[in-house]
Amino acid sequence: MGGYSMADLWAILVMQGFSGLSLFSVLMLMALGLAIIFGQMGVINMAHGEFMTIGAYAIYVCSKVASTYLPALLPYYFVFAIAIAFVVAFGVGYAVEYLLIRHLYRRPLDTLLATWGLSLIMQQVFRSVFGAREVSATLPNWLMGAWKPTPTIDIPLNGLFVMLVSVLVTLAVVLFLYRSNWGLRVRATTQNRVMARAVGINTSRTDRITFALGCGIAGIAGAAFTTIASTGPTSGSLYIVDTFLVVVFGGTASLMGTLASAFSIAQAQSILTFFMTNAMGKVTTLLTIIVILMLRPEGLFTAKVRR
């Protein structure tokens, strides 16, 4: 096939598959946050990508501080910087929900327009603070290089790290939603807001924490993003369409659907863009998803919701 031997073709497919897993990990983190905000709360957050950018810039600032003032901590700073990225994105998300989103519940068109305007404002703030050019964080040495399971296959260590972060965050979110009192409040508010309020749940505070949590997870996605690409003011907006596709295709209130959808879309794009052009690969993936959604509008998985 195209001058490739079977061994070469196998190595290419494995590396493209792993590249798809790296994309899957970032998409998964982005989609997890959006699934909580959009799926659990019904809020269309067009600024979700900018919260990813906040996390990425938080990593960049931490790398500058570590390399300039604390060089001895440079090999270890990245783990702490991920936590900082989460806290910063969480805090900004909390403020946005309190100042803007809470006034727009049950007004989806107004929410869409308001968050779209917010995304443009945030992008301009990024340009004013960090400049229009893309920046890169200084990565620790243990994130550099590749693992070679065979002489013809190279698997980047940063991709393995991104996958590990994605798995840990996914497990943490599942435990939070299904094994904690706060997760019980979130699910109760989603299923029946009036009844949840009647039994004493502060639904306004639950909404605020839920929205902030989704933004914080997007911040972690931004932290993971810095290991595989440079960061610019519009980096997050490049992922927002794919992220909405993941959530809608998987089922808006299903975490399992989000997992399956992110994996399917990432692998399809990674493999198709190798055999086609980048644009054709994405178009083919999008058209396939549209056809499937025409046949199954509720997505891959559905969740029972009481009204």
PLM feature spans:
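Transmembrane helix-bundle core of multi-pass membrane transporters
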Residues: 103, 111-179, 206-209, 271, ...
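Hydrophobic alpha-helical segments within and immediately flanking transmembrane helices
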Residues: 34, 47-67, 92, 114, ...
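Helix-loop-helix "hairpin" substructures at the membrane interface of multi-pass membrane proteins
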Residues: 152-231, 255-260
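Single transmembrane alpha-helix segments in multi-pass membrane proteins
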Residues: 14-62, 95, 99-109, 127, ...
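Alpha-helical transmembrane segments within multi-pass membrane transporters and channels
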Residues: 71-118, 125, 172, 260-265, ...
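Transmembrane alpha-helical segments in multi-pass inner-membrane proteins
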Residues: 78-79, 208-218, 222-289
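Pore- or pathway-lining transmembrane helices of multi-pass membrane proteins that form conduits
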Residues: 50-57, 102-127, 236-248, 264, ...
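Membrane-interfacial amphipathic/re-entrant helices at transmembrane-helix boundaries
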Residues: 1-30, 58, 70-80, 107-112, ...
